[in-house]
Design a protein with these regions (language model features):
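Flexible, charged surface loops at secondary-structure boundaries
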Residues: 12-13, 58-65, 93-94, 140-142, ...
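Small/polar beta-strand repeat architecture
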Residues: 15-17, 25-51, 111-128, 136-143, ...
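Right-handed parallel beta-helix
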Residues: 20-22, 68-73, 96-107, 201-212, ...
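Extracellular beta-strand/beta-solenoid scaffold signature
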Residues: 34-60, 81-89, 127-130, 183-196, ...
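Short coil/turn segments at secondary-structure boundaries
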Residues: 81-84, 112-118, 291, 312
């Protein structure tokens, strides 16, 4: 019958189910619907698209019955960044192949998507090329923040931090930055944020639109891992970033037949702030993608990459305007 039902621990149902009423469960309690595993069933159960997606994803990583989550063609209104690891709090690593497919994520609201910005002082040495030491106010510096400062190259991110030791580990080393200086740390907000995972491998996103609405960025990868695969997806109007790697979870990453649509079509090329893709690892493959009018299409730091059959352009409406690289 209709009503609200409180389930205090994990529940697995191995028969087909049709849910009436609403379920209330602790965040750490999985609901595994082995014979009715799709997003629509979870929405029926929890009456909230965001919560239903989190619980369905939790089940995906806590059950061997399915390798993929079908979003049932649903459009999920997202009011704040989805912390994918927090949805599966019992796991910080996962290496079995898993897929999310067939739906749309739609950013709504405003304040939840605002950047976190921290200004700090830290010391850098070439002897430890990916570490900042004696970092002031380190507790407030978020993992995944973009780092800016003297000697900091493009797309350098906070991969991890050690608050007790006052040390920040970076995605890449710096150049000519020895000594103590001021750094700016800016944390963008993403529709799907995997950065809470220490390691995530063989994970795939397929046939999904990420409707960022000039509010959110698209996807942030885990800290480490390999063969993240995104194919036949649309990342539409990301405010700052489309697909971000803060570590080496992009090792062997595959981006196939995806469409990156800018939020800045009428902005001069030199004034744009959005970047479609960055990667730090090796063996990245970008194939048959389309991207228009970002500051850069892709920033690739590794080696042995394949960039094939892509169509990207950076132009603006200014006669003899400044050109910026599509690939760097």
């Amino acid at each position: 019958p209709e009503g609200t039902y409180h389930i205090t621990r994990g529940l697995s149902l191995s028969a087909p189910v049709q849910i009436q009423g609403q379920l209330v469960m602790p965040d750490d309690a999985p609901l595994v619907l082995s014979k009715s595993y799709n997003l629509s069933t979870y929405i029926d159960a929890f009456k909230s698209e965001e919560l239903a997606f989190k619980k369905a994803f939790q089940a995906l990583l806590n059950s061997g019955d399915h390798d993929s989550l079908d979003l049932s063609g649903r459009s999920i209104a997202v009011s704040e960044p989805i912390d994918m690891q927090a949805a599966v709090a019992n796991r910080t690593e996962y290496a079995q192949r898993r897929v999310i497919r067939n739906g749309q994520f739609y950013a709504q609201g405003d304040t939840a998507w605002e950047n976190e910005v921290v200004n700090s002082v830290a010391t850098y040495s070439q002897n430890t090329p990916k570490v900042l030491k004696n970092v002031v106010d380190i507790a407030n510096i978020p993992v995944g923040a973009l780092v800016e400062g003297h000697g900091v190259g493009r797309e350098i991110y906070v991969k991890s931090k050690n608050v007790a030791a006052q040390e920040v580990t970076l995605s890449e080393g710096l150049f000519d930055a020895d000594g103590t200086q001021n750094f700016n740390f800016t944390r963008f907000k993403y529709l799907l944020d995997f950065s809470g995972f220490e390691k995530l491998s063989k994970f795939s996103l397929q046939n999904i639109e990420f409707q960022c609405n000039s509010k959110a960025s698209g996807i942030m990868l885990a800290r480490t891992g390999y063969v993240f695969h995104i194919k036949d997806c649309f990342i539409t109007r990301p405010k700052y970033r489309g697909l971000t790697s803060i570590g080496t979870a992009c090792q062997g990453m595959l981006v196939d037949r995806c469409h990156f649509m800018t939020a800045e079509p009428n902005t001069k090329s030199q004034d744009r702030i959005s970047i479609a893709i960055n990667a730090n690892g090796n063996d990245v493959k970008l194939r048959e993608n389309w991207a228009s009018q970002f500051r850069h299409f892709a920033i690739l730091s590794g080696s042995n990459n394949i960039v094939s059959g892509n169509h990207f352009y950076q132009g603006d409406g200014v006669a003899n305007g400044i050109r910026l690289a599509g690939l760097a």
